[in-house]
């Protein structure tokens, strides 16, 4: 009797998992129908300092930086990117445009091949005033990165003020990030 009872319990597990997936799917459909932006990720880090880190420069192995580089009194965009990310390539031209306008962008090269990343920047242009190399993805993990690209607005004191998942484009910049950027630029 016991083996049959254990078998019945095991057969019940896939049904429960399936029902949980259906519920999660329906919740997301409802959110999308209500106009919620699926790229707007809630983050427990909003309003908190950037997690402590010590990372090498992408272009200069051995030269390290820590979170203090993001606390210089001026707002910064922290852009998580990788050469394996097709959406990163799509947003790269816009990042170059922002950099040309004087917007300070720090690149966080995420789980990537360093030499490919340097070559990529050399061929497509480098919008980053600083490129950090997160080869093992630990800072990305600490930031709660789901994938690339993601962009964080960091105020002049190193506090995360906004997070955007997906490509940074003109609509996102103008409607979501620029007003906050100006707010924290004015407070510098």
Swiss-Prot record:
SUPFAM superfamilies in alphabetical order: Thioredoxin-like (SSF52833)
Transmembrane segments: 10-30
Annotated GO CC locations: outer membrane-bounded periplasmic space; plasma membrane
Thioredoxin domain mapped to chain residues: 44-186
Any one Gene Ontology molecular-function term assigned to this protein's record: disulfide oxidoreductase activity
SS bond partners: 85-88
This protein's UniProt keywords: Cell inner membrane, Cell membrane, Cytochrome c-type biogenesis, Disulfide bond, Membrane, Redox-active center, Transmembrane, Transmembrane helix
GO biological process: cytochrome complex assembly
Membrane topology, Periplasmic segments: 31-188
Subcellular location: Cell inner membrane
Pfam families: Redoxin
CDD domains found in the cross-reference section: TlpA_like_DsbE
Keyword match Disulfide bond: yes
Membrane topology of this protein: Single-pass membrane protein
Ranges per topology, Cytoplasmic: 1-9
PROSITE patterns linked: THIOREDOXIN_1, THIOREDOXIN_2
Superkingdom: Bacteria
Record-linked InterPro entries: Periplasmic_diS_OxRdtase_DsbE, Redoxin, Thioredoxin-like_sf, Thioredoxin_CS, Thioredoxin_domain, Thioredoxin_ResA/DsbE_sf
Similarity-based family: Belongs to the thioredoxin family. DsbE subfamily.
Functional summary from the UniProt entry: Involved in disulfide bond formation. Catalyzes a late, reductive step in the assembly of periplasmic c-type cytochromes, probably the reduction of disulfide bonds of the apocytochrome c to allow covalent linkage with the heme. Possible subunit of a heme lyase.
Protein name as it appears in the record: Thiol:disulfide interchange protein DsbE
Species of the source: Yersinia pestis
Gene symbol of the encoding locus: dsbE
